[in-house]
């Protein structure tokens, strides 16, 4: 059985590491009016009647697939998506970003391709890239690493933290474009080690190559989610389904649970990974499994929310009173608890 930990990423150890880091930082929160602390998708700082939302994220080991294919023109889209999708989760409109590119040695051609993707992603998200940092770090970095930090703005009385999520609320899932930018270490282990495929090989059950599927850009949810937020729909919570899978819903409110029994069929890439030996619970713990973003709304507003979000959005379950538990019906028919 292939696991994420065996692929080099230990989720439990990462959580302990983050806790160890942030436990030393809480005393600094006294220096500004912080509304949300560590652990939410984005941090909020009050500036009068408006709050600034901030988030930082990176592309991760998807960069290694780009290196294998010598194709860097889409990873910039992923970088933008990972940041702006998190900012959306507090009800804020993403506004601007700065990027960070660390390289083993400068390569103008590769940098130009990355810049092309960043510009495309910024257009999709309607954000400005206002600066950044490029660092040459031989001995520390092998090839390159790409990340960004973004800000957004939201009126204080329009902030969405998830505290209004209540049992009986409906969870709406917005489809992903594919694997997005999480779980790539496990996916690479499966395709390139277990199945012994190359990036150019056709992915089983698909007309696309393995590399094309792994590099498919992360979907940017700014347009549909901002339209939802600015409507009359009573939005109680928003969650970006990234690392940790549907466990990300537990970041909204600790004393409620979720029952997800109407999930859409995951894309073929996830089926191939599962059939190659990854346990189905591990699949839902690591990957988005076809749903890249969730909106939790009042039951009376479901129809209006769906009309706004379009045909790539589906009711996938409801909020329960089982504190901090996500129970879902997997694509195999099994019931899984996260």
Curated annotation (Swiss-Prot):
Could you give a GO molecular-function term held by this entry?
Answer: phosphoribosylamine-glycine ligase activity
* Catalyzed reactions: 2-formamido-N(1)-(5-O-phospho-beta-D-ribosyl)acetamidine + ATP = 5-amino-1-(5-phospho-beta-D-ribosyl)imidazole + ADP + phosphate + H(+)
Q: Does the keyword Ligase apply?
A: yes
Q: Which Gene3D superfamilies match?
A: PurM-like C-terminal domain (3.90.650.10), PurM-like, N-terminal domain (3.30.1330.10)
Query: What keywords does the record list, in alphabetical order?
Result: ATP-binding, Cytoplasm, Ligase, Nucleotide-binding, Purine biosynthesis
Location(s), subcellular: Cytoplasm
Query: What Gene Ontology biological process does one annotation of this record name?
Result: 'de novo' IMP biosynthetic process
Q: What is its EC number?
A: 6.3.3.1
This protein's major location comes to cytoplasm
What pathway does the UniProt record associate with this protein? Purine metabolism; IMP biosynthesis via de novo pathway; 5-amino-1-(5-phospho-D-ribosyl)imidazole from N(2)-formyl-N(1)-(5-phospho-D-ribosyl)glycinamide: step 2/2
Q: Which Pfam families match?
A: AIRS (PF00586), AIRS_C (PF02769)
Q: Name one GO cellular component term.
A: cytosol
Domain of life from the UniProt record: Archaea
Q: What class of enzyme is it?
A: ligase
Keyword match ATP-binding:
yes
InterPro entries attached to this UniProt entry: PurM-like_C_dom (IPR010918), PurM-like_C_sf (IPR036676), PurM-like_N (IPR016188), PurM-like_N_sf (IPR036921), PurM_cligase (IPR004733)
What is stated as this protein's family in its record? Belongs to the AIR synthase family.
Tell me which NCBIfam families the record gives: purM (TIGR00878)
What is the protein name given in its UniProt record?
Phosphoribosylformylglycinamidine cyclo-ligase
């Amino acid at each position: 059985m292939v696991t994420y930990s065996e692929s080099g990423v230990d989720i439990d150890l990462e959580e302990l590491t983050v806790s160890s880091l942030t436990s030393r930082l809480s005393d600094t929160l006294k220096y500004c009016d912080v509304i949300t602390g560590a652990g939410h998708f984005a941090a909020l700082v009050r500036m009068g009647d408006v709050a600034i939302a901030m988030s930082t994220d990176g592309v991760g080991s998807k960069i290694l697939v780009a290196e294998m294919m010598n194709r860097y023109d889409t990873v910039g889209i992923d970088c933008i998506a990972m940041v702006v999708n998190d900012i959306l989760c507090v009800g804020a409109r993403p506004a601007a970003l700065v990027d960070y590119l660390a390289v083993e040695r400068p390569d103008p051609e590769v940098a130009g391709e990355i810049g092309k993707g960043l510009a495309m992603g910024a257009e999709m998200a309607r954000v400005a890239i206002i600066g950044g940092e490029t660092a040459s770090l031989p001995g520390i970095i092998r090839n390159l690493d790409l990340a960004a930090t973004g800000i957004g703005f939201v009126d204080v009385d329009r902030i969405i933290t998830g505290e209004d999520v209540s049992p009986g609320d409906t969870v709406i899932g917005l489809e992903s474009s594919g694997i997005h930018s999480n779980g790539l270490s496990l996916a690479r282990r499966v395709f390139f080690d277990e199945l012994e495929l190359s990036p150019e090989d056709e992915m089983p059950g698909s007309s696309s190559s393995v590399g094309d599927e792994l590099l498919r850009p992360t979907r940017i949810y700014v347009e549909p989610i901002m339209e939802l937020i600015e409507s009359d729909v009573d939005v109680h919570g928003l969650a970006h389904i990234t690392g940790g899978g549907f466990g990300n819903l537990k970041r909204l409110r600790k004393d409620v649970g979720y029952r997800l029994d109407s999930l859409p069929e995951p894309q073929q890439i996830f089926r191939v990974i599962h059939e190659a030996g990854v346990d189905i619970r591990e699949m839902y713990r690591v990957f988005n499994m076809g749903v890249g973003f969730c909106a939790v709304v009042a039951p009376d507003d479901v129809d209006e929310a769906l009309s706004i979000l379009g045909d790539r959005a589906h009711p996938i379950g409801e909020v329960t009173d089982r504190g901090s538990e996500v129970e879902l019906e997997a694509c195999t028919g099994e019931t899984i608890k996260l």
